[in-house]
Amino acid sequence: MQVLVPTATHGECDMAAKKTIFVAFAMKDERARDFLKGQSLNTNSPFEYIDMSVKEAYDAEWKSRVRTRIRRSDGVLALVSKNSLESSGQKWEIGCAKEEKKPLRGIFAYRDDRTNLSGVSTMIWNWDSIKKWIDDL
């Protein structure tokens, strides 16, 4: 999934300059992904959502398509949960982000799940934290 985000300029949104954020998530966390999408569609949100999910098997073509999307992104946001530990697709996306030297940040997908994902700095999910991270890219 990718999210296009207007960049803030002196407290205002500059709609001409958008940042692209690739969102890595475990397929078992699709509902959390849908919630993120729903929040980004809120008219009060400074985030614009464009779905670029790839649901094909994790073959060479899938990896090539995901790598291209990550390369085009300004950063990668990972939805972190206990499911992340078993998700080969999400692990590969995170590894790819590191290989491509993209800024990487995690957000906890659930309030009661504080899974530690090695190599991913993770923050609590709220719009202020997400916006600050994106603005700092």
Tell me what each language-model feature is.
Residues 2-72, 102, 108-109:
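Conserved N-terminal substructure of TIR/SEFIR domains
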Residues 60-63, 91, 127:
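Structural motif corresponding to alpha-helix initiation and N-cap regions
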Residues 82-100:
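Conserved TIR/SEFIR loop-to-helix hotspot centered on a Trp-containing motif
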Residues 83, 107-114:
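Short beta-alpha junction loops
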Residues 112-125:
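Glycine-rich, charge-decorated loop segments at or immediately adjacent to ligand/cofactor-binding or catalytic sites
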Residues 123-137:
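C-terminal helix of von Willebrand factor
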